[in-house]
């Protein structure tokens, strides 16, 4: 009776161990997020892939990366993980084209072992190389920044850049990107064609949910470079940012 009882316990343990194994056909994908707004350069940014995850049956591996430029400032926000979407090849394009504030995205869903393995900004290097350069106009300048409002976009860190002829309106918004463990809220300011929502037609970029709220810009922020950094109107922008936070 003793040996039979022991074998029964061993059987239950074995069944329990089997139940925790990934089912046949389940993919292993990289799991990662990216959110960086300082010192982002095309050839020195690396997406570290430290973790992976087992997906549900029929799910694929997704990687979506968003590259933002405004003046000389750059930001990168990204997501890697499992996705229920159908597979699609790498798609790289401008969601908001230059001149002025530009937002580009790279996204794909694949279905092979750890296939969501992009680690650099090479797709955006090629995209930018094919984009004609714009002509700037000294008659209009705007406060410029991209980053977290209490870190990268405090008034002392905001620069003022001359605007291109085709993008001579000052733009400011608070953006929130959410997907899996990604939950990033940041400020985006710069020159644009008009002060409307730039991502109004993009509620999702891949699996990343996008929320955009326009900020109020006072005339003093638009006209003067030095005065715009320290003007009380900054309180309006920061007030909206705090209201936007969860």
Swiss-Prot record:
Give residue ranges for the propeptide.
226-246
Does the keyword Membrane belong to this entry? Answer: yes
Kindly give the SUPFAM superfamilies that the UniProt entry links to this protein: Snake toxin-like (SSF57302)
Q: Name one Pfam family in it.
A: UPAR_LY6
**Keyword set, alphabetical order:** Cell membrane, Glycoprotein, GPI-anchor, Lipoprotein, Membrane, Repeat, Signal
Give all residue intervals belonging to the UPAR/Ly6 domain. Answer: 142-223
State the lipidation positions (GPI-anchor amidated alanine): 225
* Topology of this chain in the membrane: Lipid-anchor; GPI-anchor
Q: Signal sequence span per UniProt?
A: 1-26
Of the GO CC terms on this record, one is:
plasma membrane raft
Task: Read off the InterPro entries from this record.
Answer: Fert-Immune_med_protein, LY6_UPA_recep-like, Snake_toxin-like_sf
Where it sits in the cell: the answer is: Cell membrane
Annotated glycosylation sites: 117
**Protein name, per record:** Ly6/PLAUR domain-containing protein 4
């Amino acid at each position: 009776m003793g040996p039979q009882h022991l074998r029964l316990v061993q059987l239950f343990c074995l069944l329990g161990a089997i139940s925790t194994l990934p089912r046949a056909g389940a993919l292993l994908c990289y799991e990662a997020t990216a959110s960086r707004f300082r010192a982002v350069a095309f050839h020195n940014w690396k997406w570290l892939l430290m973790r992976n995850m087992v997906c549900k049956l029929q799910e694929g591996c997704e990687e979506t990366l968003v590259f933002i430029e405004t003046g000389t400032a750059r930001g990168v926000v990204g997501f890697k993980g499992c996705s229920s979407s159908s597979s699609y090849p790498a798609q790289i394009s401008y969601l908001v084209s230059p001149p002025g504030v530009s937002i580009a995205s790279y996204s794909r869903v694949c279905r092979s072992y750890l296939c969501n393995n992009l680690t650099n900004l090479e797709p955006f290097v090629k995209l930018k190389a094919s984009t004609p350069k714009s002509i700037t106009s000294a008659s209009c300048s705007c406060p410029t920044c991209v980053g977290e409002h209490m870190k990268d976009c405090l008034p002392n860190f905001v620069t003022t850049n001359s605007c291109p002829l085709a993008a001579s309106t000052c733009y400011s918004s608070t953006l929130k990107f959410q997907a899996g463990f990604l939950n990033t809220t940041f400020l985006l300011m710069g020159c644009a064609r008009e002060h409307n929502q730039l991502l109004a037609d993009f509620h999702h970029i891949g699996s990343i949910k996008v929320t955009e709220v326009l900020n109020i810009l006072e005339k003093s922020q638009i006209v003067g470079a030095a005065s715009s950094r320290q003007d009380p109107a900054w309180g309006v922008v920061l007030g909206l940012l705090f209201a936007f936070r969860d």
